[in-house]
Amino acid sequence: MENNPIAFLILAILGASLGSFCMSLTMRFCENKPLLSLRSYCFSCYQKLKPLELIPIFSYIFLRFKCKTCHIKIPFSVFLAEVLGMIFAWIAYLLSQNIGEFIHLLIFLFVLFALSCIDLKFQAVPQKLLWLIFFIAFSFAFNSNEFAYFFIFENFQNGFMVQAFIFAGFLFLLKNFIAFLKNFRTKDIQENLGDADIIILASMAGVFGFKSAFIILFLASLLSLPFFIHNKNTKLAFLPFINAAFVIYLIYLIVRELI
C-alpha cells in the first residue's frame, strides 16, 4: 500500500479514534455497563461528554488530564489506548498488501488489546472476544483446499489449520509438562499458560507460522520475567505480554522490509 504523509495522518486519526472507542468499550465491560446503548460519559460523575471532549489525544491534553465537570483525573490508560491505536493503524497499514489484509490485522490488534486490558483486571477473558480473534485470523488465512484436506485427514498442507493445531498441541504439552515439573513434590494444581493464551498463540501460528508464534511466546516470556520475579506471590496476567511481544514482532517485520 502507498506510503505518504496524508495517509499516515488519516491513519493516526483513525487509529486514535478506534483506540478511544476500544478503551471505552473495555471500561464499560469491566464496569458491567451497557456497551453500545449509551453515549460516552465520565466514569466518575457520569456526565455525558461533549463533542470537543471526544477528540482523541488533544482533548486529554487540553482538559489537563481531568474531567471538565468533576475534575477527577482521567485514567492514563485512555490516553495510552489512543496513542497505541495510532501505532496499531500504522503497523497494519505498513504490513498490508491490500485493504482486506489491513482490516483483518487492524481488528486483530484492537481485539487483542481489549482482551489484554480485560485480562489485566480480571485475569480472565470473555469467550466471545477470544474466539472472535481466532476466527479473524482464520478468515484472513483461510484456504478452501487446505480446509477440505484437513477434515479428510489426507495430504495435510502447510496452512492455517495445520500450523494452528500443531502449535496449540505443542503449547498444551508444554503447559502440562511445566505444571508437572513445578508441582512434582506438591499436590497443588497450577497452570502456567491459560486456554486463552493457547488459542491466541495458535491463531498467530496459523497466520505467521509455527516459528513466528514460538518467537512471540519466547519474547512474551522474557518481557514477563522481571514482573514475575518482582511479584512471585502474585498471579500474573500473561496476555498483555503476548500482546506486547506480538506488536514488537510486527515492528521487526516492518523494519526488516525497510532495510
What spans do the regions from the language model cover?
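A membrane-topology feature that recognizes alpha-helical transmembrane segments
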Residues: 1-259
